[in-house]
């Protein structure tokens, strides 16, 4: 995907952008259970179908979901591998911060002993 400045964004950026909206997070949770049609996905939301379709477009462009049209029904399914990219990024950040906090804890302990 390309950002507003015309630069290509990293895939993990697209995933986090897609997940930044609560409606899209609910859709991802729903698709985690099983594939669903547009009408099934849109049913719980109080919004016009074109607005809801924009959410599905963002999810599909991020690679989190894929759609398939059979006859008049478009069905969406989750692409779990894209979530793993976000999980991996978060795990790296967690490790980095845990290491920093451990170092800080050691520093505080050293100061307390002095």
Stretches with model-predicted labels:
Residues 61-77:
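Beta-hairpin "wing" of winged helix-turn-helix
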């Amino acid at each position: 995907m390309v950002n507003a400045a015309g630069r290509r964004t990293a895939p993990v950026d697209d995933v986090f952008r897609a997940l930044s909206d609560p409606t899209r997070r609910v859709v991802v949770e729903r698709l985690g259970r099983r594939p669903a049609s547009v009408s099934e996905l849109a049913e719980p939301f109080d919004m016009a179908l074109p607005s809801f379709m924009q959410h599905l477009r963002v999810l599909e462009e991020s690679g989190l979901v894929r759609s398939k049209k059979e006859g008049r029904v478009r069905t969406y399914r989750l692409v779990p591998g894209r979530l793993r990219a976000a999980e991996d990024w978060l795990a790296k950040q967690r490790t980095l911060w845990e290491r920093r906090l451990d170092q800080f804890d050691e520093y505080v302990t050293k100061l307390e002993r002095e």
